[in-house]
């Protein structure tokens, strides 16, 4: 329970009293209201900071030049089914009604909560006379796939009969440590499968096994070898490990040996509590909103392609700092977001 915490809402009757929350032993992400309470704790910390206090509100503190938080409510609302059931209804299911992303009532409530919570921050900024000098950036690190509920196809599914995930096909190629149920390690399998092999020299054999089981795993596309290296550093163990994040000879252990992308709508799960997932390359995963607000910025829609990686250098430029102070900006040539500064600034490297 979180006594004294009420969730933000667009109307009083929509607010949830977190003091009435009775945890059932699961985490915050297993309940539509619990995730709002979790987010509201973070919102309250930001509100305290705006009002010139520590995040707990216990004492005075300088207002930060930059602050932010991560909302989980919309992400959870997109994929959660609670109570878990093979039958999805408006009473137990978030996500969307159709392929055009019409939100179900549970999902709409999560969106409205986040809307109201951001409204609390805006109101606090105005109260403290900070709104006119503040830029607000709202975006997402990922979406959820599939948006269309009719395309959701869990493998193996609760019945276990919908197919076999890649880990079930190439178990003999995987490190033995994955077999220990207590080590917390395993493949990253959601709406994508990222595979680290016990022996990278057997990559071609593992790929052949996956392709032979294409129907069972819902195979869409496989990246390995040269095709994988066009996206990431080559997989492997560095010959001479250097400082963090430097490119190193001999391979990068963060890169899997194989990346398998299933057909659209396939999610590797046997869990009845989810109807979508993230982490993959699907359009629903990677196409997210990005809103920048400042009283000096004219309201308009920018239709040019941008990436969320551009947010970080944009923040530095807004603060009067050099975006090139970031290694990634220098190495990858990441520009600031377009149309926010003087003409030509969006081409800054």
Task: Please report, for each region that a protein language model flagged, where it lies by residue.
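Active-site-proximal alpha/beta segments of enzymes that process anionic O-linked groups
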Residues: 1-58, 332-338
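Extracellular/periplasmic catalytic domains that process cell-envelope and extracellular macromolecules
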Residues: 2, 51, 58-63, 67, ...
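Active-site His/acidic residue clusters
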Residues: 14-30, 53-54, 58-113, 150-152
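Extracytoplasmic/secreted cell-surface and envelope-processing proteins
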Residues: 17-20, 76-81, 145-149, 203-206, ...
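Soluble non-cytosolic domains of exported or imported proteins
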Residues: 36-41, 101, 105-116, 200-204, ...
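Beta-strand elements within well-structured catalytic alpha/beta cores of enzymes
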Residues: 64-72, 107-125, 131, 135-143, ...
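Secreted, luminal/periplasmic, and some membrane-associated catalytic domains
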Residues: 120-135, 139-266
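Substrate-binding rim/cap in mid-to-C-terminal beta-strand-loop elements of soluble/periplasmic
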Residues: 159-212, 276-320, 335-343
């Amino acid at each position: 329970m979180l006594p004294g915490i009420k969730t933000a809402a667009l109307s009083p009757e929509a607010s949830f009293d977190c003091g009435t929350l009775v945890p059932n032993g699961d985490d915050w992400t297993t309940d539509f209201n619990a995730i709002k309470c979790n987010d509201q704790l973070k919102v309250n910390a930001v509100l305290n900071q705006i009002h010139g206090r520590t995040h707990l509100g216990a004492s005075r503190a300088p207002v930060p030049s930059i602050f932010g938080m991560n909302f989980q409510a919309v992400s959870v609302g997109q994929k959660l089914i609670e109570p878990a059931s093979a039958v999805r209804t408006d009473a137990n299911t978030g996500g969307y009604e159709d392929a055009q992303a019409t939100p179900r009532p549970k999902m709409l409530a999560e969106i409205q909560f986040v809307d109201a919570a951001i409204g609390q921050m805006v109101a606090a900024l105005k109260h403290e006379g900070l709104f006119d000098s503040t830029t607000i950036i709202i975006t997402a690190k990922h979406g959820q796939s599939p948006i269309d509920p009719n395309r959701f196809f869990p493998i193996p599914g609760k019945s276990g009969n919908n197919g076999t995930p890649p880990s079930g096909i190439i178990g003999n190629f995987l490190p033995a440590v994955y077999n220990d149920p207590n080590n917390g390690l395993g493949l990253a399998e959601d709406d994508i499968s990222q595979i680290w092999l016990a022996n990278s020299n057997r990559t071609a054999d593992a790929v052949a096994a996956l392709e032979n089981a294409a129907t069972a795993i819902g195979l869409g596309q496989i990246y390995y070898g040269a095709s994988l290296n066009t996206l990431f550093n080559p997989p492997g163990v560095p010959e001479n490990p250097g400082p963090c994040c430097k490119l190193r000879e001999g391979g990068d252990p963060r890169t899997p040996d194989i990346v398998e992308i299933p057909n659209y709508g396939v999610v590797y799960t046997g869990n009845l509590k989810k109807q979508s997932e993230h982490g993959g390359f699907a359009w629903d995963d990677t196409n997210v909103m990005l809103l920048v607000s400042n009283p000096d910025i004219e309201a308009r829609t920018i239709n040019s392609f941008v990436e969320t990686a551009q947010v970080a250098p944009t923040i530095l430029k807004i603060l009067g700092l050099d975006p090139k102070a970031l290694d990634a900006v220098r190495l990858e040539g990441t520009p600031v977001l377009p149309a926010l500064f003087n003409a030509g600034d969006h081409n800054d490297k």
